[in-house]
Amino acid sequence: WKQNQTIKSSVQDSQKIISLNCGIGLLELNLDQEIVAIDEKRYQIDDAKLNAKYLKKENVTFIAGDLDSKIVTYAKKKVYDTLIIQNERYGLSDTIKDTIKIAKFKTIIYACQSHSTLAKDLADLEKNYKLERIIGLDTSCHNSYLTTIVKLVRK
């Protein structure tokens, strides 16, 4: 809940959002902007679509598929001002990094549980983006994970 509220407050000025690793869409269904939410796990996208239907949320499009190919497809179709990345441990692929450079998102919100992965990806992203805010959240009191949420803005 804390993570979703923190991200929600960071995208208030956004109009169109792409969200990667959306899971069952808990964050995306709490936002009012136009959103394309992508996850590789079809069963989670199926649940997200059911939740959207039940909640009558028509602003979110949930897509199941390979993150690399889907972000390229959607970034070419329309201009999005914000990218949300919810990453547990794995870093961003070269395809996603290249798409970020080409799409020129105004804002990137990156939530990650692996500090080494986050540091590596930030080193690449900081070539075109400025670190505006970093927040650490204890999102699970029963383990030692700390979720770090970073807000980057285009230079």
Where do the PLM segments sit?
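Rossmann-like S-adenosyl-L-methionine
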Residues: 1-155
